[in-house]
């Protein structure tokens, strides 16, 4: 069966997350509904996805895939039709054919997120639903010093929702993490790992901000990792500032082509 990967961008404020849910608007259901209309004579399988994002979380470059009974002859026509039929807040940016063994979730070797932070005393019209407003003073140098402690293969049990990890392995490898200062008021933390647990990025960034605020004198990322206890880490930030940026596939170079968005 032919196998196709889609590159999808979406505004999470419009949806109850990625995963299909009965009687609720989700990204998966909106794309599958559109595919069902477009490919009614060539039915598509259920979508697989690189990351099942929660309600309110956005995506700039999500990868998903589906299979059909017969080849799709015209990719341009498919993209135009998908974007006409999906609701406001979802854009399908590109499509490529991939090998039959490609699976958006299980073939993925790395995932990258950013968390956007607005750092100011005063409100901005562009923050609500798009970023987290940091109102108090932050020692950004102190935050930077903690970042590299997170890099590597570690047990991140302190940085995930406790109930979701009962009896599960909590070891993940953070491949890269950095603080990016885009302007005096705008920062973002970019984090890439081989996989993430529930709320892991939101708790990690919340903890880094608590450290930057000087909330703890004796607690550091090192000590929080050692504790393996969710109560030792910082707050879970809201989903507003979280964006899925990219999925990586070491064994599937065709995905590099997927991220080359066609220009007019």
Curated annotation (Swiss-Prot):
One annotated GO molecular function: tRNA pseudouridine(38-40) synthase activity
GO BP: tRNA pseudouridine synthesis
UniProt-annotated binding residues for substrate: 113
Origin superkingdom: Bacteria
HAMAP family documented for this protein: TruA
PANTHER family cross-referenced by the UniProt entry: PSEUDOURIDYLATE SYNTHASE, TRNA PSEUDOURIDINE SYNTHASE-LIKE 1
Cited function: Formation of pseudouridine at positions 38, 39 and 40 in the anticodon stem and loop of transfer RNAs.
Protein name: tRNA pseudouridine synthase A
Origin species: Leptospira biflexa serovar Patoc (strain Patoc 1 / ATCC 23582 / Paris)
Gene designation per UniProt: truA
